[in-house]
Amino acid sequence: MFNRIISLFLLLFTGQVIALDLELTQGINSALPIAINSFGSNAAAQEIGNVIENDLTISGQFKIISGPQGANSQSSVSTLRQLGADSVVTGRVNQVGNRIEVSFTLADAVANGNILLTKTFQINANQVRALAHHISDEVYQKLTGERGIFSTRIAYISVQRNGGRSRYSLEVADADGHNPQSLLVSSEPIMSPSWSPNGKSISYVSFEKKKAEIFTVSVETGQRRLITSFPGINGAPAWSPDGQHLAVVLSKSGTPKIYDVDLSSGSMKQLTFGNSIDTEPRYSPDGRSLLFTSGRGGSPQVYRLSLADGQISRVTFEGNYNARASYTPDMKHIVMLHREDRQFNIGVQNTGGGPISNLTFSGLDESPSVSPNSRLVLYATRYQDRGVLGIVSIDGRIRMRLPAREGDVQEPAWSPYLS
């Protein structure tokens, strides 16, 4: 897939995952030490504890402190404090009729076990993982002051090959890779998934009719809507922050250019002009500009288009290939695909300019997508000759690999916060 994407870009310029496994490959010393006490011995209790521990580890902001006793036993806050925990999560799971009651407390181990948070929920059996992610969000926000991202979702393309045939599917899963759902399945390529700002729809490119077309699909119902189906390229859809427009790439007039599609009226407006190829648009979070990739300077570089006056300015100058750029939601950084010495890695640059810093180093990385809290970057890479997903923190100090158990996983997209 990596070679196919690069080959496609050069051509333009010359004429089911069951779950994802976490592997922490690099960490930091400033993580907050926290202990997750057992929620009980039954399956639901163990699953909740495991999910919370995994979530907080993925965030890169916490160091998990293990208790001295067995996995099904609870330790006192004072004991866990002696082992190094600053905070302790303790929970209980009970069956109440055909419902499950889950209670948890978050205690400050430094302040003699002072209770910071306590809540009780009643759920159905199929809501166990969702509640565990919600508890993780509550704990994360209480201790960091920031909203948690554990109840968000990810979309990606899964490719399964059998002999000479390929099966493409657009998958949506929890942020930790569990609970995957196939929104679409096709024998032809599916590309470029992008979440709507409200998290209810995904835009994508389909080749199901042996040509490129842009669709949106409802995550809840699977209902689709055809957006563009012009001769030639229909690609790289990106939502405006208000969800009312899509920026797309069309070659209907010759050279690929960026257009704005009004989703209410269907009207279109051309945004870029000239003889160079313009592609991969991404709106800024404030809706005032677009980042896009263009060869107008002689090599693929990132440019910024002001939507107020149409002025275009070059953003990247380092290296001879920078592409797939997007702002972090807080607009402090720009994340991109950066080539250096024939190695394709994920790079980051301050929004105001300056050098590009590599966040990854495998040389086979692509498709960066930033978490809604701006702290993590999800991306596609290769590991043991397979397409897998990786996560790296925006400062590069946390790196994780999420290997798929079957098929190739590619082109990830992180959802916004979900209500």
UniProtKB/Swiss-Prot annotation:
GO biological process annotation, one example: protein import
Cellular localization per UniProt: Periplasm
Superkingdom of origin organism: Bacteria
Gene Ontology annotations for the cellular component aspect, listed alphabetically: periplasmic space
Keyword Amino-acid biosynthesis: no
Signal peptide: 1-19
Keyword line: Cell cycle, Cell division, Periplasm, Signal
PANTHER family named among the record's database cross-references: PROTEIN TOLB (PTHR36842:SF1), PROTEIN TOLB HOMOLOG (PTHR36842)
Subunit-level organization: The Tol-Pal system is composed of five core proteins: the inner membrane proteins TolA, TolQ and TolR, the periplasmic protein TolB and the outer membrane protein Pal. They form a network linking the inner and outer membranes and the peptidoglycan layer.
Family: Belongs to the TolB family.
Function: Part of the Tol-Pal system, which plays a role in outer membrane invagination during cell division and is important for maintaining outer membrane integrity.
NCBIfam families: propeller_TolB (TIGR02800)
HAMAP family linked to this entry: TolB (MF_00671)
Record-given protein name: Tol-Pal system protein TolB
Lineage of the organism: Bacteria, Pseudomonadati, Pseudomonadota, Gammaproteobacteria, Legionellales
Gene name for this UniProt entry: tolB
